[in-house]
Amino acid sequence: YRLQLHAGFTLDDARSTVPYLAGLGVSHLYLAPVLTAVAGSAHGYDVLDHTTINPELGGRPALERLAETCHRHDLGIVVDIVPNHMALVSQQWRNAPLWEVLRDGRESAHAHWFDVDWNHLGGRFGLPILGGSLADELAAGSLQLDVGRPDEGGAAGQPVLRYYDHVLPLSPEGPSQG
């Protein structure tokens, strides 16, 4: 039986349904993604951290409580772990693996997480977010070189490129040639 988890229906809410579902003869709960996603995500496929259970859903303690309750009622759990989904948020520093790949390129410890053709674009990572041509965006002053602010988590103190709401890392070595 599939349960769609979100801030309004958490792991503890799912836990409260277990006796009823077991009474219906359900053998397994199929849980929508439980990994840490963008705040307020209604579906969980916009993952920010593949190593933690979403605190909006109750975190790891709530998942453990659900597992214990399911075990007592002979229900199995199937979790949609979505390793192939990751959020592209405007504040890329909220997604540490993506931030590192954008900043460090193929030298990032997370470069192998992404399907990147490093031979395309002269070995650089392309991110299609511009609303117009590069020349038009430069002429409009839409691209701003800056330093990450203290309230910007992983961007704090680092060189960044701002494009409207987007905050993008720059290589510490400076711009590449070519």
Model-found features: residue ranges?
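Acidic/aromatic-lined carbohydrate-recognition and catalytic surfaces
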Residues: 1-178
